[in-house]
Every structure is written in C-alpha cells, then in structure tokens.
C-alpha cells in the first residue's frame, strides 16, 4: 500500500479525492474525511471538518467518534481538522471528569485562534458548566481570558438592525457574563487564600 502510494502519487490521490467527494454526496462524513486525509487534501479536509462541527451544533453529538478520536498525525493536515480533533479531546476529557485538563484545552482552543470565530460562542457555552462547577476550575487569569474572548465575540457580531434581537442569544451572553463574574470572584478568593498560606 505504501509502495503504491509512493509509486503513483497523483493517480492514487485523485482516486482518493473522488472517493471523498462521493462520500460527502452520500452524507458519509467519516468516510469522506478518511478519503480526504489519504488524498492529503487539506482544503477538502477543512470543508468536511466544518460539516462535522455544524452537525455537532445541530445535534449536540459527534458522528464517527472512533475516526475523530484516532486521527493521529493526520490531525495536522489543516487547522480546522486540528480544531475538530482537539475539540473532541476536550469533550473526552470533560466526560472523564478531568475538568482542569478540559478547561485548559478549551481555553487554548480559543486563545490560539484555531477555532473558527463562528464557533466561539459554542466554546464559551461549553465553558459554562466548568465556570459553575462547585470547585473553582478556571483561575482568575484564565477567567479574564474567557471574558476577553466573550467581548471579542460580541464586538465581532454585526449589529442587528432589527429591534427584536435573538432572545436565546441575549440570555446565553448574560448567563456567560454572570458565570464569568462569579467564577472570577471565587478564583480571586481562592488564590488570595492560597497566597496567605
């Protein structure tokens, strides 16, 4: 298989691209991603990664978890694929109750700017349970970073001409601001207490 790929790179890649496009048309995202990785087609891998992320936003779950969990070095094919793999890793850490590691990864996804801007509000919403956790998960500095990310999201959103703003979005932003403020207060108290010891 490796010999074939090395001997005939252009025809093999073309076949892989065709198979990837066919899989997308049949709405088989896992297969499409696998073929685009074999073709080393970064642009198409990015497109498919975006489809996975849209599907996650619509359904609240990922399809083809086994593939996403085992991307290996191919995760570096495109920034969006890297984000998809790392975002899935965040969910895995959270599910395993490794909250500090999950929080650190979530913050890295936002501050490294590999997350698509359209996905930032989803990431901030994912931070809510960690911000509201009985134990302080985000430090004061990390909370300030999240606050800056929220303000960046709000500044980037176009001002709606319609007076009837999306109530759900407004509620989400207010919940985030409240959770961030509470977490900041708890983190400052905790860190101040630790400094005194």
Task: Briefly describe each language-model feature range.
Residues 1-197:
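Extended alpha-helical solenoid/arm regions of large eukaryotic scaffolding proteins
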